[in-house]
Amino acid sequence: MADSSADGGAAPRDVDSGLFARLAADPLATHLGITLEQVRPGYARAAMTVSPSLLNTVGTAHGGATMALLDVVHAAVSNSHGTVAVAQDVHTEFCAPGRPGDVLTAEGTEVHRTNRTAVYRIEARAQDDRLVATALARVFRTDRPWADA
């Protein structure tokens, strides 16, 4: 990812700690055991352990739990520029089952951004690098700063 900052092209910095804390305090994420690990402009990462309470009736990770992990990352990456962004569409593909005890790590990257919309790709992988799910997601970007939200 290119950085157009005036500091000579250095790697992008993480978002400010106040924004990170607000994104990390998502009540559903907390309930599901999802931990936001990193957020910087155009990138976010979170992880979730597939615990017994997150299994479906056939003993694999519930699709809703996996989708929630993708959505938490989508929210973080799309709000990483400091203004409020709201989801318009999230298309998810489930590629392989998450297994009991798996640590699923989801990473989201910015694909395209304008003043009003943005598109993100999010992938969730197990600790053995197995691709569990992927999403392509779009947001509407508001002018409202997170500080005022």
State where each predicted segment sits:
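Non-catalytic linker/capping segments at the edges of enzyme domains
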Residues: 1-47, 51
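HotDog/MaoC-like acyl-thioester-processing domains
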Residues: 2-14, 98-103, 109-149
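Hot-dog-fold acyl-thioester-processing enzymes
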Residues: 24, 28, 47-75
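Detector for glycine-centered tight turns/loop "hinges" at secondary-structure junctions
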Residues: 59, 82-83, 129
